[in-house]
Amino acid sequence: MRESLSWIAVTAAAFVMAHAGAVAQTPPAAGGAAAAAAPPVAAAAATPASAPAATSPFTTGKAASGEGKAALCSSCHGPQGNSTNPEWPRLAGQSAVYIAEQLRLFKSGARDNPIMKPLAAALSDQDISDLAVYYEAQTPTGLEADPSYWKAGEALYLSGDSAHSVPACVACHGPVGRGNLAAGYPALRAQQSVYVVKQLNDYASGARYPGPHPEQASRNGVMMLTLAKRLSPEEIRDVASYVQGMR
């Protein structure tokens, strides 16, 4: 009973935070994620996943300046932030607030990555803001969800797993995976599933924030460090495939 009440409390808290000051979400199209009988399959890599998120009011960056500074980033993250390498994250349409936070974490060493750490260390605060705003303004292109795992991933994303005290992902990341600017929750739509699997495993193992106080590294660190440990390898695989196919 205590565990059940704890799960309900976590779900309710996540839902409230996700909707407090949240930007408007675009509802799924007819036959979308909540009602579709078939997985969300992208028409082609060049087809936009959906309109870009509104420019964040929380940064002082300039997208035009960020475009020039993103030339080096594109070698891994792809043109306009649409990475084609499944191990490297897509940045197109990602929250500027979230991107800026992660770059600062890489710069400080609170988040570890042998490639990103030295690159972020060379960035000024203005560089970080410019890059963050630029990538937020880009449009993520569509990817396919694996039909073998999509339905199970949809159920976990939309409803959670009460048996293991896992709240629904939708509460924080939104019905179409746009995230929540005000709360600092990242967009997940059209993200590479291989990358999502790695990040969830890194949360569970503590590798994402390896410092002595990982719960203080990021605003959403406490929640994800806890929840990722409750997910089975199959659940991680399923939900990662589902978000890859989101528009």
Question: Can you annotate each of these PLM segments?
Answer:
Residues 73-80, 131, 166-177, 239:
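The canonical Cys-X-X-Cys-His
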Residues 82-83, 109, 137-148, 156-163, ...:
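Inter-heme linker and motif-flanking segments adjacent to c-type heme-binding CXXCH motifs
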Residues 121-143, 199, 226-247:
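C-terminal capping alpha-helices of c-type cytochrome domains
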Residues 1-60, 104, 233-234, 244-247:
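N-terminal export/targeting leaders of redox proteins
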Residues 125, 149-157, 216-217, 222-225, ...:
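Short amphipathic alpha-helical linker/capping segments at the junctions of internal repeats
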Residues 28-70, 84-85, 137-163:
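Electrostatic cytochrome c docking/interface patches
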Residues 56, 63, 67, 81-111, ...:
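Gly/Gly-Pro-rich "capping" loops immediately C-terminal to redox-active cysteine motifs
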